Amino acid sequence: MSNSTVVVVTGVSSGIGRAAAEKFAKRGCRVFGTVRSIAKAAPLPGVELVEMDVRDDASVKTGIQSIIDRAKRIDVLVNNAGMSLTGAVEETATAEAASLFDTNVLSILRTAQAVLPHMRARRSGRIVNVSSVLGFLPAPYMGLYSASKHAVEGLTESLDHEVRQFGIRATLVEPSFTRTNLDINAPQASSKIADYDRERALASNAVVGSVKSAPEPGGVANAIVEAALGTWRMRRTPAGQASLLSKLRRFMPAGPVDASLRKSFGLG
């Protein structure tokens, strides 16, 4: 086990993080999965659970150090933990936006800052940040979530330029809708403005429908494992809708992309 690749995956209680942790374990890696509460987390075969709140500086430092103490190193960090938020931009309170960015963006800053000294000392490592197709596409009525994922994209690309001198690479995985509870149970902006009611409902129903018909997390988990262990590429979009959307964004004119996106959110 001492020669196995040591992988840390944040947010393994359910969904994509749990599926990714399982796949790393099956690949023979030594896997540490972080959860907010071990007492409330279901056991995960082949995965060592670590209690860590990615929104708390001290918790992240303690959690990462405990893994290093046990495994003596961290080869791969997968930043998967995240949350969603729906509602019009005008409806979203700054406190709600701050909480979202704390979880989706600043958590990556915390974990990266905790692992990078050790990776720099070893002159190797890989950081995989789970973004979204909404990191390169707009999303009506998911504006703040989309903004947080755009931030993840910029942070990751900049980080990669900074750390490659140390033999470390950062990379992105950009899934589309996946059949998890993240979007089905997404919190809504607490302040509702009646003028947005009709379109907000249409967009919300479209998202729920897309999630219910979306693939299970296994495909995204495969992309994460390849991003971590395979040849470095800046971004990976899982096969299917995510890959198609990436190609549309790159190769289609802006007008048709805009019209297609509005249609997919039920806005005509």
Predicted regions and their residues:
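Conserved glycine-rich cofactor-binding loop
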Residues: 13-14
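Active-site helix of classical SDR
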Residues: 112, 148
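Residue(s) in the substrate-gating loop at a strand-loop-helix junction
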Residues: 132
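C-terminal beta-strand-loop-alpha-helix "lid" module of Rossmann-like NAD(P)-dependent dehydrogenases
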Residues: 162-211
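Substrate-binding pocket helix/loop in short-chain dehydrogenase/reductase
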Residues: 88-89, 96-98
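A glycine-rich helix->loop->beta "capping" turn
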Residues: 66-79, 85
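Rossmann-fold cofactor-recognition segment
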Residues: 45-58
